[in-house]
């Protein structure tokens, strides 16, 4: 599982879950994770029929977030990752944990966690830095505290 997915537009590149063709099911939680990304009907279609998708099809159904030329794939993924590292680490952690808990354990559990994170983040150095940087019209320098 991954939070973001970038795929090449190479016509030989496909994505799919072929395990049912072998008489087994997708490993590593594929049966549980795919419907959370695509919805039940599309996930069933891809898994039960071992359908392979081109990059355009994967993008259209939401399985990948972005399609780029093969020559740009590593640079694009690196730039994306570097951009993410500039985000406030505590807030990013809060969003990732809150979304996972909300999806896995339910809306109410997710809200409880959001409430706890909101209090923690409001008192953080990163929140102060973010607000100060905004008022001073400069880029923030987050430190994860």
Model-derived segments and their meaning:
Residues 34, 58, 95, 134:
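Terminal peptide-recognition signature
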Residues 129-144:
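K/E-rich alpha-helical interaction surfaces of small helical-bundle regulatory domains
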Residues 41-44, 53-60, 88-93:
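Short, structured loop/turn "capping" segments at alpha-beta junctions
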Residues 1-47, 61, 76, 80:
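CoA-thioester-processing core
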Residues 49-52, 125-129:
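Short acidic-aromatic low-complexity motifs
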Residues 6-13, 64-112, 119-125, 141-145:
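C-terminal long alpha-helix characteristic of the crotonase
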Residues 30-33, 42, 91-94, 114-117, ...:
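Hydrophobic alpha-helical segments typical of transmembrane helices
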Residues 4-6, 45-51, 57, 66, ...:
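Well-ordered beta-strand positions
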